């Protein structure tokens, strides 16, 4: 990417590992002053390299003990209505990831739920209010064990 050098790449890698690292500590790692690091981070934010900062939060804090992966086969994967229909889903606190992808299933939604009943309620609402006339079929998987999980942005 234009305007990015090796020092910027190190800064981004370090922030991915620990977004709470101090500017002084980060400066030590890249051989710059805290002020110079701050300027580089602001540049990376303006360029869109750094889109935000997140915390890895245990979903059980919110009473959500069940993680589900919902795959959706769309009737028309290129439907112009898709972005508008997905907008409210993207804003739901318990939905952490929504992807449009290649393959048999076109959408993947990952979310956390209190229990199977709340997952079922979400699925009924999803089909009735959002995916009516758009989805051919869905496939739901329950996560049994988590080995690695990225942070979830808190808004």
Curated annotation (Swiss-Prot):
Residues 4-65 form the HTH asnC-type domain. PROSITE patterns: HTH_ASNC_1, HTH_ASNC_2. Keywords: DNA-binding, Transcription, Transcription regulation. The keyword Phosphoprotein does not apply. One of its GO terms (biological process) is response to amino acid. One of its GO terms (molecular function) is sequence-specific DNA binding. Pfam families: AsnC_trans_reg, HTH_AsnC-type. Residues 23-42 bind DNA. One of its GO terms (cellular component) is cytosol. This is Uncharacterized HTH-type transcriptional regulator PH0045. It comes from Pyrococcus horikoshii (strain ATCC 700860 / DSM 12428 / JCM 9974 / NBRC 100139 / OT-3).
């Amino acid at each position: 990417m234009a305007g990015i050098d090796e020092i910027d790449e190190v800064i981004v890698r370090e922030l991915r590992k620990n977004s709470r690292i101090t500017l002084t500590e980060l400066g030590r790692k890249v051989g710059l002053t805290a002020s110079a690091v701050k300027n580089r981070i602001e540049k990376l934010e303006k360029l869109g390299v750094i889109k935000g900062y997140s915390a890895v939060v245990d979903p059980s804090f919110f009473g959500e003990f069940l993680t589900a992966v919902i795959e959706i086969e769309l009737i028309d994967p290129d439907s112009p209505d898709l972005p508008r229909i997905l907008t409210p889903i993207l804003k739901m606190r318990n939905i952490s990831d929504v992807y449009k992808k290649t393959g048999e299933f076109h959408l993947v939604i990952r979310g956390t739920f209190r229990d199977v009943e709340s997952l079922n309620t979400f699925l009924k609402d999803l089909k009735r209010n959002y995916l009516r006339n758009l989805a051919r079929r869905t496939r739901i998987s329950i996560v049994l064990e988590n080995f690695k999980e990225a942070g979830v942005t808190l808004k």
